[in-house]
A protein has these predicted regions:
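AAA+ P-loop NTPase catalytic core and its hallmark functional loops
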Residues: 2-250
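Conserved AAA+ ATPase small/helical "lid" subdomain
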Residues: 63, 242-303
């Protein structure tokens, strides 16, 4: 990581793993899908790790699930990652976009206030008023940029976006074309270049979400991201992630192993009991691995 990026609170994957990406691209002899930076085997190695090439594992997930996701994107289908909050859906979408496009900067954050111009395009109103609609006055949003440049676009928490705004994706996912009715001639039609696709994420258990239309659902392949089932893997992840956060916070020590083990066991027990119909109060928070990492970080800072 270059010196100017040392003080970033959270460096993007393209910056954090730039050396690994360069190494994989240099050693990649397999054919790449059109518009991709890496082949499918190299993209898999980037996400799941490869000890032979000294590539780190970046997420705990089934290898078969990653392979299905890569095949979905390679065949031009949109990918929808669904699951409970805190299951690393956003991290996984960032890693997939970085492996395919070289970066994951084209991101739409869904929310109740998200509008269509934040997804597709807007206008520089000074130029629009003085010179009328033109390509110079058009301000491209992430979806426009992704189609123009042939890159992956991430749509985080798509179900938090109003239904009528979600459906603006239909034409881009099916016909791979965006119509700009304000312009004339060739500029009024933007055709997607090779490499363009959409990775969306949605929470299955959360408040303030909207149902997706059946038409939009048909244009995505759905992949469920499950919580980490293996205790040892979850403990290792919490330990490594909390240690990295503590080092970033300038804390010289780590959380003791016994404390981490108790923390992870408590979270797992609460998750298991929360799914049962018992007399205990219903949990109002998702006891996810990400939340366990946050608690471990706070414990380390407080100690």
């Amino acid at each position: 990581m270059s010196p100017q990026n040392n003080h970033l609170q959270r460096p993007p994957a393209a910056v954090l793993y730039a050396d690994e990406l360069a190494k994989l691209k240099q050693n990649d002899n397999a054919p790449c899908p059109p518009g991709w930076q890496l082949s499918l085997p190299a993209a898999r190695a980037f996400i799941l790790g490869d000890s032979a090439q000294n590539i780190s594992r970046k997420v705990v997930i089934s290898p078969s699930a990653v392979e299905r996701m890569l095949v979905t994107l390679a065949t031009g289908r949109g990918l929808m990652l669904v699951g409970e909050p805190g299951t690393a859906k956003s991290l996984l979408s960032e890693l997939l976009a970085t492996a395919i496009s070289g970066d994951a900067w084209l991101t739409i954050q869904g929310g109740a206030s998200t509008t269509e111009d934040q997804i597709k395009y807007g206008w520089n109103y000074a130029l629009l008023i003085n010179h009328g609609p033109s390509t110079e006055a058009l301000v491209p949003a992430p979806l426009y940029q992704g189609m123009r440049d042939g890159k992956i676009v991430r749509f985080e928490e798509i179900t938090r976006t109003p239904l009528e705004v979600q459906d603006c994706l239909l034409g881009m996912l099916s016909d791979r074309v965006m119509t700009v009715p304000e312009l004339t001639g060739e500029a009024s039609q933007l055709y997607a270049r090779e490499g363009f696709n959409i990775i969306a994420t949605a929470n299955t258990r959360d408040r303030g979400v909207n149902e997706m239309s059946a038409a939009l659902k048909r244009r995505f392949d759905f992949e469920t991201v499950f919580p980490i089932m293996d205790f040892a893997q979850e403990l290792e992840l919490v330990a490594s992630a909390s240690a990295r956060l503590l080092a970033h916070s300038g804390i010289p020590h780590k959380v003791p192993d016994a404390v981490l083990e108790l923390l992870v066991r408590t979270f797992r027990d609460l998750r298991a009991n929360g799914e049962k119909k018992t007399s205990m109060d219903t949990l109002t928070a998702i006891m996810s691995t990400a939340e366990a990492v946050n608690v471990a970080h706070a414990v380390g800072v407080r100690a």
